Amino acid sequence: MKKSFLIMTDSSTTLDREWAKNNDVMILPLSILRSDHTLIVDDGIESKPERIYEDIDNGYTFQTSCTPYGVLIEAIEQKLQEYEKIIFIGISSGFSSQFNNAKNLEKEYQDKLFVVDTEDFGYSLEHLVYKIKAMLSNNISFGDILKMINKHHDYTSSFLACENITGLVRSGRIPKIIGTMLKLSKVTPIIKAEWKNHRAGMALNIRSAPHKILENINHVFDNQLNNHTIEKVCILQAGLSSERIDELKNDVINHFHVDKEKIVIRSGPPIFLVYVWKGALGIQVIANIPKKHVEKKH
């Protein structure tokens, strides 16, 4: 007898892989191509952060891409032998063609495959999975679950800062001329990750970047963030020391007056580490109030 629902996501999430296996969640691997044409499958084994940092130290650069189309089709076909329905929630369509590829298959698997553009990544996807699981266990209607998924990004905000922008410049995610200007001025760019990346100002350096990020996030929610309106705060880190992580937690607590139990720490997904490099940091907030200042899709 088939199970009712499978949640299918991808390796842009921070979700624990063992937990996923035991909870009817499949994490599809995205693809990482090293500059020597070595293909790294982002499966949490080939793509461990330590391996990525070592490759960067050895001078390699990277390009990334979606799950190969054939692998995606095979995964859907296989899982529909085990499950009645698949809910697909992967990386934002602004970062990858992953969503478009899955959406194109929705018609072929009508009433079996349901694909939603999350406009998100990282811990926001992890949190979304938990919400879906909770609603399923409480017998919430499938229609209401899909409505929640479609609106989830209205309650999330993500900002990043990286100490070394070389990976972003080489990949074309920051134009070379802007990259040169940033290196000469020795400032740290702040990146707003909302559907896709947007420039969100500068910090004097990586040490002062968290303060700028927290101010930006608060502005997104019209300065209404506090312990009552925040569900979770995730600190995304790329090889930071435990001391630095503790400093960031204190920054979040002092800025939002939020309980420390609402703060989680996650390593950045490898699909992003290959661009932002070691020393980068990010902060993702999930609130129970909607954003007021939103970047329009274009």
From Swiss-Prot:
Keywords in alphabetical order: Lipid-binding
Recorded superkingdom: Bacteria
Amino acids binding hexadecanoate: S65, S96
Record-given protein name: DegV domain-containing protein UU535
GO molecular function, one term: lipid binding
UniProt keyword annotation of Nucleus present: no
Domain DegV: 5-287
Cystine pairs: none
Pfam families: DegV (PF02645)
Function: May bind long-chain fatty acids, such as palmitate, and may play a role in lipid transport or fatty acid metabolism.
SUPFAM superfamilies according to UniProt: DAK1/DegV-like
